[in-house]
C-alpha cells in the first residue's frame, strides 16, 4: 500500500494537481535556488555589458545580433522544424505577430537601457509577471489580495517615485543637447522627440519608458501562453519567434549599414562580448527560468530570483569598470563618456530597497483565511473559528474604490468636509505659486510654494484623523479610533513647535546681520496667501473657541445598565453606561486651526516687513517680525500640547473635577452602600468621558437599584462611558479564603477615610 500510494500521488503534470501544489522538500530545492541566483547574477553582468556595447552599436543592429545568436542556438538544439506537429498557416501568422511584438518590446527595453543605464534598467524591468499582475490587481480590482498586497503595491509605486524625483542621475542632466550619435537614425530621433514632448529629462523619460515596457512584457507573456500550447511548447515558440525576428530585422540592418557610418572599427573584437550577452541574457536566463518554474512554485521562483538580481545591480553599479568602453575608447572611434555616468545615488538605493520589499510581498501567495483560532462550538456541534486579521481583511479593496469611499465619508461630516475644502484651496494656491515661480524663475515663489506644500501635509494628517475617528470599533481596537484626533493634534502641535524653534533661531541670526531682500514678488504672494489663510481662519475658528468653551457644557447620553451575579464565593454586579457627550476638546481641529493661524501670522509678518523695507529700508524688520511670529506660534501651541498630553496620559478632565467630587460624595450617601474603591475617570476622546468604580454594598441590598443610582449620579457629572463593579460580603469571604483577612480587605476598600480634598474640590488619593 505504501508503494502504491506513496510519492506525489496528488501531483499532476509538472508537479501540481487539482488538489493543490505539493510542497517539495527544501533540500531538493536548494540546487535550483542556487542555480537561479547564479543565473540572475550572470544576467546582471550581461546587461552591464549590453550598455557598453550600445555606445558603439546601433540599437537595431544590437537587437538583430542578439536575435540572430539566440535563434541559431535554439533552432540548433530545439529542432523546431523536425520535432513536433506541423505548423499551420494560421499559426505562422500568430508567430509573425509574436515576433513583431517581441521586437518592439526589445526596442523599448534596450532604448530605456541607453537612457537610464544598466542599474536602473535592472531595478525597473527585471520583475516577474506574477509581481506585475499582483500590482495591477491591487490597483484596478476590488479583490487585490488583502492589506499585504496593497502594502507591496505601495512599495512598488514609492520605488518608482524615488527614481523619478530623488535620483540625481547627472549624465543626462548635464547634456543640454544630445550628441549627434544619438540621432544617427530616424528611429532614435523619434524616440527622443517623444520623450522631449513629455517635458522631462532623458533619464526620467527612460524610467517611464521602462515601466511601459515592463507592462507590455507582462501582457506579451500572458497572451503568448495559448500560442505556446498550440505550437508545441514555449521553447519551440521562442525558437521560431527569434528566427522570424531575424528575418524581419535583416532588411532594416542592411539599410542602416549602407546609410550610416559604423563606430566599430573591428566587429571581430566584439564577438566575445556579444556571445556573453547572448548566452547570459537571452539563453541561460530563459532555460533556467523554465526549469525552476517547473521544479518550484512560480511565486517562489519570482521571489528567489528578484533579490539576487537587484543586489547584483547595486554591486555592479558601484564597482563596474566598463571594460568594453575602455576597449572601444582605445579604438578612438567611440564617443568618450565619463566613468561616473549613471552612478549610485541615495534615491537609487532607497528605490532598490522598496523594489526588493515589493517583489517579496507581491510574489508571496495570499494567505487570507488560512489560519484561525478555535473559539467554541455551535449548538449543532460545528466548530467555530476566529480568523486572525479579519479586522483588517474586510477593509481591503482597490485603490480607486478606497478613494471613492473615503471621499464619500469625508464629505458626510462637517469637520472633515471643511478640512478637505481648505486643503483643495491650499493645494490650488500652492501649485499656482510653484508654476508661476518656475515660469518667472523666482526662487522666493518656489520656496514659499514648497513651504505651503509642507503645511498641506498637516492638513492631510488632520483630514485622515477626522476620517479615522469615525471608523467602527473592531476586535483589536475595541474602543474605536476616537483618540486618533487627540494624537493628530499632539503631532501637529509638535510640528508647530519645531517650526517656531527654527524660525526663532534663524531670526536671531538675521538680527545680528540683517540680509538684503528682494521684495519684488513678496507682496502679491503674501497677500494671496493671507486671503487663503483668512478663509481657513473663518472655517476653523469655531474649533478653537469650541475647545475652550463647549467642554463645560452638560453631557447628554442614552445609557443602559445591567447586573451580573457571580456564583461561588462572590456576588458581583456590573453596570455600563454608554453615550455621546455634547462637546469636548477636539485637538485635531485645534491643531489644524493653529497651523492656519501660523500661516496667517507669517503672511501678515511678510506684508508688514515688506512695507517697512520698501518705505524706510529697515531690513531688520524682517527678522523682528519673524521673531515675534515664532514667539506667538509657540505660545499659542503650548495649551494644545498640554491638553493633548493630559488626555493621552489619562488625566482626570480638569473641567469635571468639582462635579466628580460632588458625585462621589452623593454615592457615599446612597442607602445600602458601604463604600467604594478604585474610582478612575478619564477623557477617551472629544465626546467620551470614561470611568470605572468598585462599590461595596450590604448583603441584603438589590444590586440593580444601586447600579442605577450610581450610574445616574456619575452621568449627571459628565461620565458617559461607565463600568461599575458591585461587591458584597461573599466577595470578602472569598478573598479571606485566598489568605487575605476579612478586616484587611474591608480596611483596604474604605478609602473615603484616607482621601484628602482640596478647597477647590480636587481630590487626591
UniProtKB/Swiss-Prot annotation:
Endpoints of the signal sequence: none
Disordered: annotated span: 551-581
**Which InterPro entries does this chain map to?**
Cation_efflux (IPR002524), Cation_efflux_TMD_sf (IPR027469), Msc2-like (IPR045316)
Biological process per Gene Ontology, one example term: zinc ion import into Golgi lumen
What GO CC annotations are associated with the protein?
apical plasma membrane; cytoplasmic vesicle; endoplasmic reticulum membrane; ER to Golgi transport vesicle membrane; Golgi apparatus; Golgi cis cisterna membrane; Golgi membrane; membrane
Binding-site residues for Zn(2+), renumbered to this chain: 451, 455, 595, 599
Could you tell me which residues belong to the region His-rich loop? 542-578
Catalytic reactions on record: Zn(2+)(in) + 2 H(+)(out) = Zn(2+)(out) + 2 H(+)(in)
Q: For the region Mediates homodimerization with SLC30A6, what residue ranges are annotated? A: 420-640
Q: How is it modified after translation?
A: Could homodimerize through the formation of dityrosine bonds upon oxidative stress.
- Primary subcellular site in the record, as a coarse category: Golgi
- Which membrane topology term applies here? Multi-pass membrane protein
Give yes or no: UniProt keyword Endoplasmic reticulum. Answer: yes
* Transmembrane annotation, as ranges: 33-53, 57-77, 99-119, 121-141, 153-173, 194-214, 239-259, 268-288, 304-324, 343-363, 419-439, 449-469, 484-504, 521-541, 593-613, 618-638
Q: Which residue intervals are topologically Cytoplasmic?
A: 1-32, 78-98, 142-152, 215-238, 289-303, 364-418, 470-483, 542-592, 639-765
Subunit details: Heterodimer with SLC30A6/ZNT6; form a functional zinc ion transmembrane transporter.
Q: What does this protein do?
A: Together with SLC30A6 forms a functional proton-coupled zinc ion antiporter mediating zinc entry into the lumen of organelles along the secretory pathway. By contributing to zinc ion homeostasis within the early secretory pathway, regulates the activation and folding of enzymes like alkaline phosphatases and enzymes involved in phosphatidylinositol glycan anchor biosynthesis. Through the transport of zinc into secretory granules of pancreatic beta-cells, plays an important role in the storage and secretion of insulin.
Q: What is this protein called?
A: Proton-coupled zinc antiporter SLC30A5
Amino acid at each position: 500500500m505504501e508503494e502504491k500510494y506513496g510519492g506525489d500521488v496528488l501531483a499532476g503534470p509538472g508537479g501540481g494537481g487539482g488538489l493543490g501544489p505539493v510542497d517539495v522538500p527544501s533540500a531538493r530545492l536548494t540546487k535550483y535556488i542556487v542555480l537561479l541566483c547564479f543565473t540572475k547574477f550572470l544576467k546582471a553582468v550581461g546587461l552591464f555589458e549590453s550598455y557598453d556595447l550600445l555606445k558603439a552599436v546601433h540599437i537595431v543592429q544590437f537587437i538583430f545580433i542578439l536575435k540572430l545568436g539566440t535563434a541559431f542556438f535554439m533552432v540548433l538544439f530545439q529542432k523546431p522544424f523536425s520535432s513536433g506537429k506541423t505548423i499551420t498557416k494560421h499559426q505562422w501568422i500568430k508567430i509573425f505577430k509574436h515576433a513583431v511584438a517581441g521586437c518592439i518590446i526589445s526596442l523599448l527595453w534596450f532604448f530605456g537601457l541607453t537612457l537610464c543605464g544598466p542599474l536602473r534598467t535592472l531595478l525597473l524591468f527585471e520583475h516577474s509577471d506574477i509581481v506585475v499582475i499582483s500590482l495591477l490587481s491591487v490597483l484596478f480590482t476590488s479583490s487585490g489580495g488583502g492589506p499585504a498586497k496593497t502594502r507591496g503595491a505601495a512599495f512598488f509605486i514609492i520605488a518608482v517615485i524615488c527614481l523619478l524625483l530623488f535620483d540625481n542621475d547627472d549624465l543626462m542632466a548635464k547634456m543640454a543637447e544630445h550628441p549627434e550619435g544619438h540621432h544617427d537614425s530616424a528611429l532614435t530621433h523619434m524616440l527622443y522627440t517623444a520623450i522631449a514632448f513629455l517635458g522631462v529629462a532623458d533619464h526620467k523619460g527612460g524610467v517611464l519608458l521602462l515601466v511601459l515596457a515592463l507592462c507590455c512584457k507582462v501582457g506579451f507573456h500572458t497572451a503568448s501562453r495559448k500560442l505556446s500550447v498550440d505550437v508545441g511548447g514555449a521553447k519551440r515558440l521562442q525558437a521560431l519567434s527569434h528566427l522570424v525576428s531575424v528575418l524581419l530585422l535583416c532588411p532594416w540592418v542592411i539599410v542602416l549599414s549602407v546609410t550610416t557610418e559604423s563606430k566599430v572599427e573591428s566587429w571581430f573584437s566584439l564577438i566575445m562580448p556579444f556571445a556573453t550577452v547572448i548566452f547570459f541574457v537571452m539563453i541561460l536566463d530563459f532555460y533556467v527560468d523554465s526549469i525552476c518554474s517547473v521544479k518550484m512554485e512560480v511565486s517562489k521562483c519570482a521571489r528567489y530570483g528578484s533579490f539576487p538580481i537587484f543586489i547584483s545591480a547595486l554591486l555592479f553599479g558601484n564597482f563596474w569598470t566598463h571594460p568594453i568602453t575602455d576597449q572601444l575608447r582605445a579604438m578612438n572611434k567611440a564617443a568618450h563618456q565619463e566613468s561616473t555616468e549613471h552612478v549610485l545615488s541615495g534615491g537609487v538605493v532607497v528605490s532598490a530597497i522598496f523594489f526588493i520589499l515589493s517583489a517579496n510581498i507581491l510574489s508571496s501567495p495570499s494567505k487570507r483565511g488560512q489560519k484561525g483560532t478555535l473559539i467554541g462550538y455551535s449548538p449543532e456541534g460545528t466548530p467555530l473559528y476566529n480568523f486572525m486579521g479579519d479586522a483588517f481583511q474586510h477593509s481591503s479593496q482597490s485603490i480607486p474604490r478606497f478613494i471613492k469611499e473615503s471621499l464619500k465619508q469625508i464629505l458626510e461630516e462637517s469637520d472633515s468636509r471643511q478640512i478637505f475644502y481648505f486643503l483643495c484651496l491650499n493645494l490650488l494656491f500652492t501649485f499656482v505659486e510653484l508654476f508661476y515661480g518656475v515660469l518667472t524663475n523666482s526662487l522666493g515663489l518656489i520656496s514659499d510654494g514648497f513651504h505651503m506644500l509642507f503645511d498641506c501635509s498637516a492638513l492631510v494628517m488632520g483630514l485622515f484623523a477626522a476620517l479615522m475617528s469615525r471608523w467602527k470599533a473592531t476586535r483589536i481596537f475595541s474602543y474605536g479610533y476616537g483618540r486618533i484626533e487627540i494624537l493628530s493634534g499632539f503631532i501637529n502641535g509638535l510640528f508647530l513647535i519645531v517650526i517656531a524653534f527654527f524660525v526663532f533661531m534663524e531670526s536671531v541670526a538675521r538680527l545680528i546681520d540683517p540680509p538684503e531682500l528682494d521684495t519684488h514678488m513678496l507682496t502679491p504672494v503674501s497677500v494671496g496667501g493671507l486671503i487663503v489663510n483668512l478663509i481657513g481662519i473663518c472655517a476653523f475658528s469655531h474649533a478653537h473657541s469650541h475647545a475652550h468653551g463647549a467642554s463645560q457644557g452638560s453631557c447628554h447620553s442614552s445609557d443602559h445598565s445591567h447586573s451580573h451575579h457571580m456564583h461561588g464565593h462572590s456576588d458581583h454586579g456590573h453596570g455600563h453606561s454608554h453615550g455621546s457627550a455634547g462637546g469636548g476638546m477636539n485637538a485635531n481641529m485645534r491643531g489644524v486651526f493653529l497651523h492656519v493661524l501660523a500661516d496667517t501670522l507669517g503672511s501678515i509678518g511678510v506684508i508688514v516687513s515688506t512695507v517697512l523695507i520698501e518705505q524706510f529700508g529697515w531690513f531688520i524688520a524682517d527678522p523682528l517680525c519673524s521673531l515675534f511670529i515664532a514667539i506667538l506660534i509657540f505660545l499659542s501651541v503650548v495649551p494644545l500640547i498640554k491638553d493633548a498630553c493630559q488626555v493621552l496620559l489619562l488625566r482626570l478632565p480638569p473641567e469635571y473635577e468639582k462635579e466628580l467630587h460632588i458625585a462621589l460624595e452623593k454615592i457615599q450617601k446612597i442607602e445600602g452602600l458601604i463604600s467604594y474603591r478604585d474610582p478612575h475617570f478619564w477623557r477617551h476622546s472629544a465626546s467620551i468621558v470614561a470611568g470605572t468604580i468598585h462599590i461595596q454594598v450590604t448583603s441584603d441590598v438589590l444590586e440593580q437599584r444601586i447600579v442605577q443610582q450610581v450610574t445616574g449620579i456619575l452621568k449627571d457629572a459628565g461620565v458617559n462611558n461607565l463600568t461599575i463593579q458591585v461587591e458584597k460580603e461573599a466577595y470578602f469571604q472569598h478573598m479571606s479564603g485566598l489568605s487575605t483577612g476579612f478586616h484587611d480587605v474591608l480596611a483596604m476598600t474604605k478609602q473615603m477615610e484616607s482621601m484628602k480634598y482640596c478647597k477647590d474640590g480636587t481630590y487626591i488619593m
